[in-house]
């Protein structure tokens, strides 16, 4: 779409396609046109045309979108133009306050971005973009509509100041945000609070939409102020339960005034739910205020006011019937315990009354289990932390938790059991299906349940016996009672979960022998129920009960089975009488019997199988447990009979989901750990263990050769690859790994190679095979350090080379792929290939020099495949997909460390691509990637420096090595900006960024400085000259100190000296730049 002839009508059609169009092609074309419009010299005039003459809100929105992108470009518009845009928008929204809300919001975002990016810019000795605060006050003096716009401007500005733009240096963002915090944020909060006081001072007309909108925007403004990232810690907002608000000390007076908290509690009681929940959100932040803001007496008084507010809300609970209010109030209660100690809470005058009200509120909430289930998390967090604090309370005041905690536990237990009948009869969504939430709530409950444990245990025993009896009656009753049976099974599932929870609670709370005996009473009943239900397999099954049983078994394992636990635990006293289980050896037998039973009868139920196998895997970690396990008959049976005949989940029927095959890796990892206990050097034992896989591979070979049943072969190979990966993962000794290698090579690796050739376009097949290859290449625990007479290392690498080359060549034939397919179809496989190659190059089990010596091209071939695959990937994709970047950059590090001859032989465009990828990787937030980039760059710079240093001297190196160095030097001379750009990036990181890998950054920086002293001098002068005169001398001294004692070489001693100097330099420069002078931050950017 050519832009030069676009009329207003054509632009409005573009808007329609962009915002409300349903045709995907038209929308993509509109997006392209939008990008062209932003780059067009006519952009501003077109935006003005749309704003002033556009007939739809979408036209105005397009103008705002274009302006937003225009003002945030890396190369900013002239300051005069930006001031004009800011003033134009202010006048525009002031003259048209009835614009669509989303248009006003979008235009105000442009003002906020302009203000943030120009915060330090000076014109005629004034910070021109800071005048926005004064401009807003004019809006606040106008109509209600103008007042709303003014508040939205302040709210957007506060949020924009708090927003980290990862495309710009984080240190610049922090400097702007800190200056805004120190100069403006407190005034904005005071202004917002005064507006709210004015609202409360006169009768509220809740029918007036404008007034409601004003109150909403002011509350959002207060919340933005309190949510500000005051310290620049960028805490993860999802970590809601651990948040402390780092209020600046200068705000103390606001927080010490009781009227401040009263204002928000009064607003909660006065406003309708949509607004009152915002008032509660503000109170959540007030309750989270850092403790150190107050002295001890002040903190006690502040806490007292918070508790009074809680009491008033709970005594007038009508507002809590709204889910939004209810959720925020639950968060508020949780934050109280996060920020205040139980010892402080019990000293509050109203504590006894309020803890009773909170307990009743919690019990009511638990009983109404279907109402706002996500909010229960916060209530359980409160009680969990209260109970966990009991041992540390030194106050004589009663905490009353021994009264209320058992009631909370009882309410949870009874409410969950009562919910089952409602869920089954009304066909509602079952809370048990959301296992993540169930596990989270149970882990919180386990601490609470151990407080006054006798009461909880008595209740559970009574309920379990009653429900078990009802279940047995139903088993012997006439058919046709399916609903009653479903209810009873659901109740039993909850009870098993709950028993597992309270048993697991032993680890979180002080326990006695009597408590252990109670655990035995409860556990007895679950083990009896397990036996009863397993006798009814396979005819009667219940997935929920099985998952609950596995939870219980895992909790019992963690609590009572292990190396460090006492063998004489009282838990076994009752279990010995009833079940004959006298110690953890007997328990392990029960565990393994249950595991084998599940694997036999639950083969097609993926949740049960995967949880069972995870339980088996957890059991198989730890030598002492393994020694006990291998003596158990059930384990011996598994080691000899791991076939689909005995364990159906190992089958390959077309009715089975290929995705479920993943669990086979877990199974074989655990099984191989068990095999390894007594394997030693017994090759016959290993051959017997591998027999089922041998049979499968021979079948595959036969079918492959006859060229039929290809779908069956593919499924078999997927399963075999996953099995072998599990086996290879567990073989961590040279002897055992050699047995596997001798088994798989040369007989079966070529089969996998053929599979890659045939099904290269099917990730379901190629991914397991490539992951197996990557595992085989891992020299974990030096397992691949074969004997000196063995060629196995080279043979393994040759096979890996063939497979990577085959995959690389075939995958490129797929051509271009859509965004949603490019990772699963192509990039995932490439990342696994790179990971495998990296393991080979760094594994130290292959002498790569022999390949060229003997004319073997496998090494060269795999490196060429690496290059071909790399060139098919864009730089943005390299960094966007984490697994790809975390395999590519460490691989490049290996290549630059040991194979610089390969790097120097790359064609100039390829070398430029590699160096550009390094440069972009240096700026990423992923420290694994950025550190790898620094190391790779250091190897390259060191190689180049050494070559230059040896020029003109008598050559000790081969002519070939000299030519390689010369090629790299010539390339750098032809492309001087490459290393200069990287030096700019590293200096920028040191001076302006939150540099988390300073040591890694320092290593290549010295070499870059020594190779580019002239450019380094220019960077130094640029930074120094951008500062006011008083700072110039300080910065000059910082740079002199940086190079003090540093010599013109890259010896380890010299590097270490430079690294030490750099640490001091970074600190001193940060201090020099810290003061809020007239510094234009854009001039400080060494990359601009």
From Swiss-Prot:
<keyword id="KW-0811">Translocation</keyword>
<keyword id="KW-0509">mRNA transport</keyword>
<dbReference type="GO" id="GO:0006913">
    <property type="term" value="P:nucleocytoplasmic transport"/>
</dbReference>
<dbReference type="InterPro" id="IPR044189">
    <property type="entry name" value="XPO4/7-like"/>
</dbReference>
<keyword id="KW-0597">Phosphoprotein</keyword>
<comment type="similarity">
    <text>Belongs to the exportin family.</text>
</comment>
<dbReference type="GO" id="GO:0005737">
    <property type="term" value="C:cytoplasm"/>
</dbReference>
<dbReference type="GO" id="GO:0051028">
    <property type="term" value="P:mRNA transport"/>
</dbReference>
<comment type="function">
    <text>May function as a nuclear transport receptor.</text>
</comment>
<dbReference type="InterPro" id="IPR001494">
    <property type="entry name" value="Importin-beta_N"/>
</dbReference>
<keyword id="KW-0007">Acetylation</keyword>
<protein>
    <recommendedName>
        <fullName>Ran-binding protein 17</fullName>
    </recommendedName>
</protein>
<dbReference type="GO" id="GO:0006886">
    <property type="term" value="P:intracellular protein transport"/>
</dbReference>
<comment type="subunit">
    <text>Binds to nucleoporins and the GTP-bound form of Ran.</text>
</comment>
<dbReference type="GO" id="GO:0005049">
    <property type="term" value="F:nuclear export signal receptor activity"/>
</dbReference>
<feature type="modified residue" description="N-acetylalanine">
    <location>
        <position position="2"/>
    </location>
</feature>
<feature type="modified residue" description="Phosphoserine">
    <location>
        <position position="569"/>
    </location>
</feature>
<keyword id="KW-0963">Cytoplasm</keyword>
<dbReference type="GO" id="GO:0005643">
    <property type="term" value="C:nuclear pore"/>
</dbReference>
<dbReference type="Pfam" id="PF03810">
    <property type="entry name" value="IBN_N"/>
</dbReference>
<keyword id="KW-0906">Nuclear pore complex</keyword>
<keyword id="KW-0539">Nucleus</keyword>
<keyword id="KW-0653">Protein transport</keyword>
<keyword id="KW-0813">Transport</keyword>
<dbReference type="InterPro" id="IPR011989">
    <property type="entry name" value="ARM-like"/>
</dbReference>
<dbReference type="GO" id="GO:0031267">
    <property type="term" value="F:small GTPase binding"/>
</dbReference>
<dbReference type="InterPro" id="IPR016024">
    <property type="entry name" value="ARM-type_fold"/>
</dbReference>
């Amino acid at each position: 779409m050519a832009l030069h002839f676009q009329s207003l009508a054509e632009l409005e059609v573009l808007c329609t396609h962009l915002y409300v169009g349903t045709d995907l092609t038209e929308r993509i074309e509109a997006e392209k046109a939008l990008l062209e419009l932003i780059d067009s010299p006519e952009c501003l005039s077109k935006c003005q045309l749309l704003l002033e003459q556009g007939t739809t809100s979408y036209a105005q929105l397009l103008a705002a979108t274009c302006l937003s992108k225009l003002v945030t470009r890396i190369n900013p518009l002239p300051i005069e133009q930006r001031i004009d845009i800011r003033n134009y928008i202010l006048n525009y929204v002031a003259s048209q306050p009835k614009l669509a809300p989303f248009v006003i919001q979008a235009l105000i975002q442009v003002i906020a971005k302009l203000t943030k990016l120009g915060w330090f810019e000076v014109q005629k000795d004034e910070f021109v973009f800071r005048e926005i605060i004064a401009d807003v006050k004019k809006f606040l003096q106008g109509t209600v509509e103008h007042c709303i716009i003014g508040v939205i401007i302040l709210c957007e500005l506060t949020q924009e100041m708090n927003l980290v733009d990862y495309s710009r240096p984080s240190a610049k963002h922090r400097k702007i945000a800190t200056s805004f915090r120190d100069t403006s944020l407190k005034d904005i909060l005071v202004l917002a609070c005064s507006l709210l006081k004015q609202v409360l001072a006169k009768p509220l007309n809740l029918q007036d939409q404008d007034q409601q909108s004003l109150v909403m925007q002011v509350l959002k403004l207060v919340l933005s102020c309190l949510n500000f990232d005051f310290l620049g810690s960028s805490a993860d907002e999802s970590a809601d339960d651990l948040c402390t608000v780092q209020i600046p000390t200068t705000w103390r007076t606001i927080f010490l005034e009781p009227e401040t908290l009263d204002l928000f509690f009064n607003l909660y009681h006065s406003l309708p739910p949509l607004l009152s929940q915002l008032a509660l959100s503000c109170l959540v932040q007030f309750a989270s205020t850092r403790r150190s803001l107050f002295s001890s007496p002040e903190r006690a008084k502040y806490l007292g006011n918070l508790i009074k507010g809680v009491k008033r809300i709970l005594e007038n609970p009508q507002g809590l019937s709204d889910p939004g209010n209810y959720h925020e109030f639950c968060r508020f209660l949780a934050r109280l315990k996060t920020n205040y100690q139980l010892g402080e809470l019990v000293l509050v005058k109203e504590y006894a009354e309020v803890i009773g009200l909170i307990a009743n509120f919690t019990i009511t909430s638990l009983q109404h289990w279907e109402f706002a289930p996500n909010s229960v998390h916060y209530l359980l967090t409160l009680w969990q932390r209260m109970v966990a604090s009991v041992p540390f309370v030194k106050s004589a005041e009663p905490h009353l938790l021994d009264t209320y905690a058992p009631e909370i536990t009882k309410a949870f237990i009874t409410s969950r059991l009562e919910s089952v009948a409602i869920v089954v009869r009304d066909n509602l969504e079952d809370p048990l299906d959301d296992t993540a939430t169930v596990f989270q709530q149970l882990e919180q409950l386990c601490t609470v349940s151990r407080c006054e444990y006798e009461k909880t245990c008595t209740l559970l025993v009574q309920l379990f016996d009653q429900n078990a009896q009802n279940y047995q009656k139903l088993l012997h009753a006439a058919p046709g009672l399916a609903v009653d049976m479903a209810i009873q099974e659901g109740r039993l599932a909850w009870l098993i979960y709950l028993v597992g929870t309270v048993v697991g609670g032993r680890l979180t709370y002080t326990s006695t022998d009597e408590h252990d005996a109670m655990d035995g009473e409860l556990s007895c009943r679950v083990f009896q129920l397990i036996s009863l239900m397993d006798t009814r397999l396979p005819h009667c099954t219940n997935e929920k009960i099985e998952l609950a049983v596995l939870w219980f078994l895992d909790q019992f394992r963690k609590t009572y089975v292990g190396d460090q636990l006492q063998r004489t635990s009282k838990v076994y006293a009752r279990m010995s009488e009833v079940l004959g289980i006298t110690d953890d050896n007997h328990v392990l037998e029960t565990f393994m019997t249950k595991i084998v039973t599940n694997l036999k009868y639950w083969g097609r139920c993926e949740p049960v199988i995967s949880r069972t196998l995870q339980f088996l895997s957890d059991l198989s970690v730890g030598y002492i447990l393994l020694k006990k396990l291998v003596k158990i008959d059930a384990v011996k049976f598994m080691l000899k009979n791991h076939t689909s005949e005995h364990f159906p989940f190992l089958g390959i029927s077309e009715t089975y989901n290929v995705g479920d095959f993943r669990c086979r890796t877990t199974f074989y990892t655990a099984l191989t750990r068990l095999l390894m206990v007594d394997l030693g050097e017994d090759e016959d034992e290993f051959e017997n263990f591998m027999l089922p896989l041998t049979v499968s591979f021979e079948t595959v070979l036969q079918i492959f050769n006859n060229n039929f049943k290809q779908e069956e072969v593919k499924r078999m190979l997927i399963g075999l690859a996953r099995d072998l990966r599990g086996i290879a993962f567990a073989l961590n000794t040279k002897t055992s790994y050699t047995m596997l290698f001798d088994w798989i090579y040369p007989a079966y690796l070529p089969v996998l190679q053929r599979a890659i050739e045939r099904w290269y376009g099917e990730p379901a097949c190629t991914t397991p095979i490539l992951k197996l290859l990557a595992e085989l290449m891992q020299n974990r625990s030096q397992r691949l350090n074969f004997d000196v007479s063995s060629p196995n290392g080279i043979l393994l690498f040759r096979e890996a080379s063939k497979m990577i080359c085959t995959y690389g060549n075939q995958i490129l034939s797929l051509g271009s792929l859509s965004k949603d397919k490019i990772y699963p179809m192509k990039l995932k496989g490439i990342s696994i290939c790179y990971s495998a190659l990296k393991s080979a190059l760094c594994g130290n089990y292959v002498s790569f020099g022999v390949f060229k010596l003997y004319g073997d091209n496998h090494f060269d071939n795999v490196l060429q495949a690496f290059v071909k695959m790399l060139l098919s990937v864009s730089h943005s994709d390299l960094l966007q997909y984490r697994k790809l970047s975390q395999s590519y950059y460490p691989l490049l590090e290996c290549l630059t460390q040991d194979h610089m001859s390969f790097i120097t032989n790359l064609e100039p465009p390829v070398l430029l691509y590699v160096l550009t990828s390094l440069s972009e990787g240096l700026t990423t937030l992923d420290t694994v990637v950025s550190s790898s980039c620094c190391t790779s760059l250091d190897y390259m710079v060191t190689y180049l420096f050494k070559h230059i240093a040896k020029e003109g001297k008598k050559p000790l190196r081969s002519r070939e090595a000299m030519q390689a160095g010369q090629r790299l030097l010539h390339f750098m001379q032809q492309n001087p900006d490459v290393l200069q750009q990287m030096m700019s990036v590293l200096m920028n990181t040191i001076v302006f960024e939150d540099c988390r890998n300073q040591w890694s950054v320092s290593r290549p920086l010295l070499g870059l400085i020594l190779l580019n002293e002239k450019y380094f001098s220019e960077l130094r002068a640029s930074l120094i000259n951008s500062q006011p005169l008083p700072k110039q001398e300080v910065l000059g001294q910082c740079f002199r100190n940086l190079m003090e004692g540093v010599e013109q070489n890259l010896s380890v001693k010299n590097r270490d000296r430079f690294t030490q100097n750099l640490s001091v330099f970074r600190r001193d420069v940060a201090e020099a730049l810290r003061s809020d002078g007239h510094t234009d931050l854009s001039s400080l950017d060494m990359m601009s």
